[in-house]
């Protein structure tokens, strides 16, 4: 019940309007519910300065069909739009967006009836740090590797020693568990609900093979997964705050030993 996100890139929406309408009509006639947007190259700068959530739709794109040259020009324009100033603005906005979301949906990964997408430790926490990492490391944008974006992101964390290999493994397993729960919530309720209510917990526990009397063990596993996502996202957001939101000069850092130093209450690996 989650939409297929489809972005159509056009040199001129006015000129290509009939072809665009034909594509969308064919999808609907084929029973494919696509949430589509149509963009032109100037939209990159437009949404960069006006709409954070619309701009993030430009991340994680995969070329499917059409004019490869136009897609490459779009990709290059997206990369070039993210300079040091826009990095600071975007990451600052993402940090504030996380704060507001937690305020609205819950700032604890151990809520009794969490929103598996929006509450602390939910999928959007994972996606938010993924997007922030993309902004700070532009080669991650729009990777065409035959891996999920989550796997590409976690491989980047491991490769750059941003966390341990064991923690990366736990993070990916946690993400997959919460994602599976969301998929089953949509399937069992036949709706786009993300609220993990008590009735849904009982039903999904049985689908995961738990006995009726063992709901607590199932939810314990969910809370453990949500806590891992929350802990890693909190740690990475602290790092981004130091680097982009409230940067502190290197002269204010202090060496702890030959491997680690501390700056603005955050410990870094040399």
Segments predicted by a language model, with ranges:
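A nucleotide- and high-energy phosphate-metabolite-utilizing enzyme signature
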Residues: 1-270
């Amino acid at each position: 019940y989650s939409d297929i996100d489809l972005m159509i890139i056009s040199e001129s929406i006015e000129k290509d309007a009939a072809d665009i309408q034909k594509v969308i009509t064919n999808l609907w006639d084929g029973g494919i519910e696509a949430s589509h947007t149509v963009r032109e190259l100037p939209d990159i700068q437009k949404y960069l300065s006006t709409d954070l959530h619309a701009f993030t739709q430009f991340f994680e794109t995969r070329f499917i069909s059409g004019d490869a040259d136009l897609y490459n020009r779009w990709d290059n324009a997206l990369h070039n739009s993210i300079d040091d100033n826009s990095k600071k603005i975007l990451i600052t906005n993402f940090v504030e967006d996380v704060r507001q979301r937690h305020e609205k949906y819950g700032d604890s990964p151990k809520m009794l009836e969490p929103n598996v997408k929006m509450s602390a430790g939910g999928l959007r926490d994972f996606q938010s740090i993924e997007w922030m990492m993309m902004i700070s490391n532009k080669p991650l944008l729009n990777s065409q590797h035959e891996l999920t974006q989550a796997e590409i992101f976690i491989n980047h964390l491991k490769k750059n020693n941003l966390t341990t290999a064991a923690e990366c493994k736990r993070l990916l397993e946690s993400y997959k568990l919460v994602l599976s729960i969301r998929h089953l919530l949509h399937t069992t309720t036949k709706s786009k609900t993300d609220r993990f209510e008590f009735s849904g917990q009982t039903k999904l526990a049985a689908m995961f093979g738990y006995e009726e009397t063992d709901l607590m063990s199932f939810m314990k596993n969910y809370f453990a997964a949500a806590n891992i996502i929350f802990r890693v996202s909190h740690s990475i957001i602290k790092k981004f705050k130091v680097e982009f939101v409230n940067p502190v000069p290197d002269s204010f850092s202090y060496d702890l030993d030959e491997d680690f130093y501390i700056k603005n209450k955050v410990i870094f690996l040399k």
